[in-house]
Structures are given as C-alpha cells and as structure tokens.
Amino acid sequence: MMAAAVVRAEVRRQRREERKKMAAARTTEDPPENHVVADVACGTGAVTRSSSSSLVVSSSSASGSDEPSSASPLSFPVCSPSTAVRSPGSAGVSTSLCSVERMVELSAQSPAADFSVSEAWRFEEAVNMALVACEAVSPYDRFRLIETPDENFLLVTNVIPRESAEVPVLDSSSSGGDSGPEDKKKNVGNKTAGEKNGGGSRAKRRRRRRAPKNDAATPSFLRRHDVLERFAAAAEPLPSLCVRDYALRNADRVTYDGELIYGSYLLYRKAHVELSLSSNKVQHVEAVLRQVYTPGLLDHHNVCDVEALLWLLYCGPRSFCARDTCFGREKNGCPFPALLPKLFYEPVRDYMTYMNLAELYVFVWYRGYEFPAPTPQATTAGSGGGGGAGACAVETSASAGRVDDAGDEVHLPLKPVSLDRLREVLQAVRGRFSGREVPAWPASSRTCLLCALYSQNRLCLDLARDEARTVSYSPIVIQDCAAAVTDVTLSHILPGQSTVSLFPVYHVGKLLDALSLNDAGLITLNL
C-alpha cells in the first residue's frame, strides 16, 4: 500500500511539473520521431500515445486485436507527443519498450555543449513512466530486462497468459455405444429443438456446460458403473511393504524354461578392466581433482576434502577384495581392488553424481572401521619433522601392495594423506548418512572383477537348477573381450525367437593369464 501511494504521489508530481513545462514550450518544435518511444501492451490492455501528450492504457478486445477501445483509459503524462511504436505480435505480453537510439546519437555529438540537459531529462522520464506503466498493469510480477540488437531494452512481464480453460461436462447423450433407445430419442428431440430455434451449436454448448440432474439414474451410467465395479473386483491388492531389502522380486523361480530374473547388465570394456585391477590410479585421480574444486560443481553437504575421500575409495584399507581366496593373492601377493561402477573408471561428466556415489561407497565400506593408532616409531618421526602424532602421514611406499599381519588391510596410497584428514572425512560421511535409509545393498559387496566373474559362473552352473525364488544379480559383460567367453551359457527360449544368452560364462583362468603387472602398479590385459 505504501509503495502504491508513493507511485501515485510521484505521478501527480510529474504531472504538475509537466504541465508547467509544456505550457512554456508550446511554441517550440517537436523533437524527432525516434526521440523517446514508450509502448506497453498486454493481454487485457494496450498503451498508446494520445494527442494530449499522455500515455494512455486502454483495454483491447479479447481476441488480441491491436486496435484499442475507448473504455476506461488511464492517462500518464509524458514529455513529448509522438506516435507509439507497437511491436508485431505483442498481444498477450506486458512489455515496455524505450528507445535509446536518440540518446546515443546525442551523447556522441561534438562539442559536448550541444547536448541539451532537457534531452537527458526527457529520456529519464520516459524510462520512469515505462516502469510506472508496467507496475500499474501487473503490480505483483517481476520484470525481466532484455536488451535488443537495435540498442533498445525491453521490460517483459506476464509472459504466460492467464486463461481458464473450460472443461465440458459430458452427459448421457455423449456416452457413445452405451446409449439406449430412450437416450437416442432425447438426443433427436434436443437436436430438432435447437435447429428450429436457429441455434443448434449454441444449444450443444449449453448442454455440455450443464450437467444433467439425474445422471446417476440413467441406464448408461449404471452400465458404466457395473463395468468399473468388475474391474475393481478383479484387481489384486498391493503387497504390504514390510522389509526394505532393495532386492528385485519380479519372478518366482529360476529355470531354463521358466522366468529368469536378472538386473541391468553391467557393461565394462577392456580399459575399465585394466584400471579396475590396477593399484596405481594416480592419473585418474589427478584428473578428477583438477576440476572438482570448481565453484558450483558440488553441493554444500558434500565432503570438502575430496583427495582424502578418493584415497579411501581407491586405495584405502577397505577398498580391496574381501575374499580370502581372491585371485590377486595368487597372482600378485595381494588382493585386487574392489570393483566399482563404470563411471568411476571414466572421465567424470557429472561431478555431483560421482561424489555422492563415492561418499556412499566409503560410508558402507568403512562402517565401524577405525584407523589404528600410530606406532611409536611413526610418532617419533612425526614429532621430529614438526608434526604431532595425529598429523603423521599414511604409508606411501612405491612398492605398495603389501598385506599386513591382520590380513584384511592393504595400503596402496596415491599420495601421503594424514590420518587426521582421513578421520575427518569418515566423520563427515558418517554424519551425512547415519540414521538415514540409504541403498546400502548395491555398495555392500567388496569383490574384485575376477571374483565377481567367478561368482557369476557359479550362479549359472550351480544355482540355476535349484529352483531359487529370487536371484538379485546383475550380469557382468565385458564388451571387447570375446576371447574369454566360453560356450557354456545360461539361456532360455523366448516365444517365437531364438536362444537368448542371459548370463555369459567367462574363462577366469584365461583372463588371469592375460594380466601383466608393471613396476608402476599398472595392469595390462593382453587379449
């Protein structure tokens, strides 16, 4: 209310000043046509310039015609009379267009003394009056300032028209094939009456708008109600959600000739296999750290220390295969790194998704884990270097790949990371996910690629014949390693189609023999 009162007072003051100035300047010559132009158009009104040097807001026709009517004009005085410029197709949009071409021309003239002060005042007044007109048309809307190529600016509001669509009410006459003989007679009688009155179309529109009072008693309505009752009786109630185990339960059994449940295929390529089995992921992590700290990529709840988070994900003590019989222990003397989704082995496209999944895996893998206290030797070395016991760095030897005495911790660090940083990251991740229901089932497995393929082979050969009710497993498919695929597959016959292979069986021994490890910790797959 106060803002509206201030605007009205300002308009009245400008009117009084304008009357005085126009009375003194009646004999002066009018400015050029492109001096100052203000135009406002909307779905319910249009702004034009009248002969009395005022900005007139008048209502237009409902059909969007450009010709303004003479009903209830609202006048706003302006400094100079000129012809309003209407942009084509502007009906339905509230706009305010103020030309600044004349302003630019006058400011570029030399000498500067020729530039009249009244010209600048008139331009400023035109801009103010355009704002007042827009606020008068739509006082509660926000404006968007758009600069046009011809050095104009456009104030736009009410871009979306506010029209209420009228939904016709269907009566018994529009029920289609369910209408009986009585309904047909009623329709014929209504049509004849409408034609006699010369307003058949108007009678139809009135019938659509007016719902019949006895709609529930018509035979067609009763028949439709019976059909809906039969559909409702045949529907089965939804099962109660008692346990959230995030498992797929869309099949009853696993057989060769029945239904086989499987998740989406996990597609990997040769490059993904090499990076997933390699203990040295320095180049990949450095590429991630190069862009991850760009403002706007991450949210406020993400972990701040991304380097420590990636250390825990790629080379922390819980980032390796948890099987006691891992193939990596026989091949290299230490287990292979745990298998992650494919996006962790590719250039990052969505940093938000990447970081959220990384935090989820770290939370699940390190649940209940605490880093051991530093040894006295490490404490002495840390204090001698100027750091305390909590600031000592995790071991970073080039010959990493060594299993400790406990048998479940492997240290393959990327770069030296202090224990304090790791503890802070774990605390931040636990604070984010603790006490919340998170899909921990997909991330709970700490299995390398070769052990996962071995389990997939066992599933195909052993578990398929046991009539298992549910198999929640996503088959792994290596796309460009066809030489390692055997002829043994679990398949079933689809009706009218050929045999479809669902779970491919891979030759794990051939894949293991094709791996070669260099001194830098990189693995190459020679297939």
Curated annotation (Swiss-Prot):
Location in or out of the cell: Host nucleus
Stretches with biased composition (Basic and acidic residues): 9-33
Principal place of residence: host cell
Keywords for this protein: Early protein, Host nucleus
GO cellular component: host cell nucleus
InterPro entries hit by this protein: Herpes_UL95
Regions of compositional bias (Basic residues) in chain numbering: 202-211
The UniProt record lists the keyword Transferase: no
Taxonomy, superkingdom: Viruses
Stated family: Belongs to the herpesviridae UL95 family.
Role played: Participates in the expression of late viral mRNAs. Expressed before viral DNA replication, UL95 assembles at the viral pre-replication complexes (pre-RCs) containing the early viral protein UL44.
Name of this chain's protein: Protein UL95
UniProt source species: Human cytomegalovirus (strain Towne)
